[in-house]
Amino acid sequence: MNNLSPPSTVDILEQVYQVIQQRKSAPDPEASYVAKLFHKGDDAILKKVGEEATELVLAIKGRAARNEVAHEAADLIFHTLVGLAIMNIPPTEVMNVLSSRFGKTGLTRNQTPSVELEPSRRQFERRLHSKTIHLIFSSGITIDGLTRDISLDGMQLHVDYADKVRLLGEKGYFELSVQNKATFNANNLLVGLEIPTTMDNNPLMAAVHSARTYRFEFEIVRVTEDAIGLRIIGDKGMFSFALANEVFNDLM
């Protein structure tokens, strides 16, 4: 009797990935389909990934036969692995991220993760704060969320909203007041200020503070039981400027 258990999903993905790694460096582009893709370059590979994703979307949207949808999904997974091979990212690394994202913790960071991950490349840019953000959606919905985690890409918010699933893919905006701080020598000020003289004739310093409100557009890209994840779209440079000015440190 054969007591061997069937290969797991991770095992299958890893085996396919190893074959891709072996074939991608073949000197002859006609040696295999993978070799031909890599000889065409990264752009050709990424274009193919996009094409396969579109075909899967169309198959699902058109309610194609189950085997056809499964076939398109397999094509997309295969070409995604080819894309990962460009950067030598194994599927096990992706599965670890998935385990962390959709495990018991979801977006919550104050619990023990289901899988211990290596530090993210953007971990040094992430900041933990607690600030209320007023979200205004294109659909007209308005929701207040409490920040949990913020990075240059976006933020995670705790929200008390019953139908959060419907928010996935929704776009909108929020506004933040960013304070600019500057220090000027009193002898060089171009504005009229009454500054008392000092006995030691030391230069007087005046701190000038101004604030400006900026609008940031977002898209909801993740939803869990009690939180949403949003991605900043549009001008990320201004959001980076807001972070640099500690806009999330003031408040509650």
UniProtKB/Swiss-Prot annotation:
It is found in: Cytoplasm. One of its GO terms (cellular component) is cytoplasm. Keywords: Amino-acid biosynthesis, ATP-binding, Cytoplasm, Histidine biosynthesis, Hydrolase, Nucleotide-binding. One of its GO terms (biological process) is L-histidine biosynthetic process. CDD domains: NTP-PPase_HisIE_like. It comes from the Bacteria. Disulfide bonds: none annotated. Pathway: Amino-acid biosynthesis; L-histidine biosynthesis; L-histidine from 5-phospho-alpha-D-ribose 1-diphosphate: step 2/9. Its EC number is 3.6.1.31. Gene3D superfamilies: MazG-like (1.10.287.1080). It catalyses: 1-(5-phospho-beta-D-ribosyl)-ATP + H2O = 1-(5-phospho-beta-D-ribosyl)-5'-AMP + diphosphate + H(+). One of its GO terms (molecular function) is ATP binding. Its main location: cytoplasm. Pfam families: PRA-PH (PF01503). Belongs to the PRA-PH family. This is Phosphoribosyl-ATP pyrophosphatase. It comes from Magnetococcus marinus (strain ATCC BAA-1437 / JCM 17883 / MC-1). The lineage of its organism: Bacteria, Pseudomonadati, Pseudomonadota, Alphaproteobacteria, Magnetococcales. The gene is hisE.
